[in-house]
Structure formats: C-alpha cells, structure tokens
Amino acid sequence: MTTENLNLPVRQYQKQYKGILSAVFEATKAFAGVTSAIQILDGVQHNAKAFSVKTNATPVVVGEYSTDANVAFGTGTANSSRFGQMKEVIYADTDVDYDYALSIHEGIDRYTVNNDLNAAIADRLKLQSEAQTREVNKRVGKFLSDNAGKTETLADFNEASVRKLFNDLSAYYVNTEVIAPVTVYLRSELFNAIVDMTANTTSKGSSVSIDNNGLAKYKGFTLVETPAQYFDTGVVAIFSPDGIVIPFIGINTARTIEAIDFDGVVLQAAAKGGTFILDDNKKAIVKVTSVALGG
C-alpha cells in the first residue's frame, strides 16, 4: 500500500475528536455517578502508561502519649519517646496503564458522499464517538464487576428477597463507614421488582410512580435503571458511591489524508483507554448477581 500523498496536506482533527468524544461521553455514559468526568488527552506519546498517582500504604496507628517516668526520662533518656514509635510516611508513584484501544478507519468519496466533506467528517466523528461511548460503557461495567469488594447473590426477584438484599447492604455500608451517598445501577428486572413492591406506598413516604414506572430511592439508595448490555454476565446491579472511578482516553491521532484510490479523504483515528480506581475504594463497590440471570 502506498503512503505517498502528492504533497497534499494531512489535516489533523485531534482537538475536534477530543471535544466531541468528551461531550458525547458525558451526555450518554452509563454508571454516570460512579465515574468522574472522563479524562481525555490528545497527542499522547506513551504507548502504555496513561498517568501516575501518588499512593501511600503507611497504616495509621492511634497511639497513646506515655507519662512513664522512664520513657524519655530516667533510664529512657535519649533512647525512647513519649510519643511512641515513629513511622516514616513515604509516597510511591503508581503507574496507571492503558488497557484497550480504539480506532477509526473510514473513507469519504467526494463523488458519492452527497454532502459537504467537512460536514460529513463532523458527522462521522460524532457517530464514532457515540459508538465508542457505548463500548466504554461496557468496559466500565466489566471493570466495576471485576473490582467489586463484595458480591451478593439474589436468588429471585420476590419482594422478600429484594428487601433482604437492600437491608443487608444498608447495614454493610453503615458498618464499612462509607459516608458518601450510594447509587444503585440496576437492570430493568430488579428495578421493576422494586417499583412493584407492595410495601412502596405513599403512607410510608415512597415516591413510587406506576404511571411513570419510576422510583427515585429505596432504603436510602438512589436507583438508576441501566441497560442490561452494560452489565457483566449474570450481574443485575452495581452499588457504588459517586466519583470513585476514573475513565480515561489518550488520543494518538485523528486525521484525514487525501486518498489515492478514490476522489476523497481517508478518516483515521487511533486512541487508547482505560479505567482506574484506588484499591481503598473497592470495598465500597458491591455487585449483585442473579441466579435467574445465570449469575
């Protein structure tokens, strides 16, 4: 395949691609609360490392101040401290790697496109961004499942089983001392089971709406009905506080090149992506599998 370009310019679209992908992702992302704003960087050069974070594994020790006569004084002079043993605090640089790739490779022929060339390029970048967002949504769902610190299994969607699940997880979050509000991203099967529960009545302060098939919260958890295709196999729900997962994409290139074999341009883009969470936050993610769904 020839790479000659007859001295014609290569037009770069990294900035446009970055802006469109970022806007589309924020508008249509699944698991919207759990993920922070997507980090998109154009012109990346590292082929593996996305960024580094400062981490600290030094445990916190609650000490007691000693007033013993032989600590720091008497026989303990110059060889002991009333503050107790001293621990050194050191931060490590932890690299975060890319773990998947994205690409675009399309041709736009002036002779057949039946539209303005620049308008067609903008349309394709938008449509590609929408498709790539759906792909990233699936990857985030798989990432949440793989990194959940706790797994619960729901035997069925009966009212008693669902109520027990939420009661158990309410106690789990209280005892784990997760103070941030927790959102539940759940498939329609579980969401509808909660909406249809006989216990959800206005006399108990429930905001359930049969007309709109809606229920904002249950047992203190915010409910977000989420498409089934974004969950890992057998998973019916993900519980998580907001903002603890960072999705990121590095754009290597986005360009058009004048084609040799037809009267038009070749639209190409290459990018890498990944997802990150601190180990400390994994205990705050709970996945719920369903026997009925093969979990």
Predicted regions and their residues:
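Helix N-cap / beta->alpha transition motif
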Residues: S103-R110, V184-L190, G220, P227, ...
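Extended, compositionally biased alpha-helical segments that mediate assembly or anchoring
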Residues: T2-Y13, D242-G295
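Assembly/oligomerization interface modules of large self-assembling protein complexes
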Residues: I20-Y100
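Long, contiguous amphipathic alpha-helices that act as assembly "spine/axial" helices in icosahedral shell
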Residues: K87-E152, L223, I260-A271
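Extended, solvent-exposed, turn-rich assembly/linker loops in the middle of proteins
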Residues: D146-K219
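Intrinsically disordered, low-complexity segments enriched in Gly and acidic/Ser/Thr residues
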Residues: V208-I244
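Short, extreme N-terminal leader segments that mark the start of a protein/domain
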Residues: M1-K29
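Alpha-helix boundary/N-cap detector
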Residues: L8, Q12-K15, D123, L127, ...
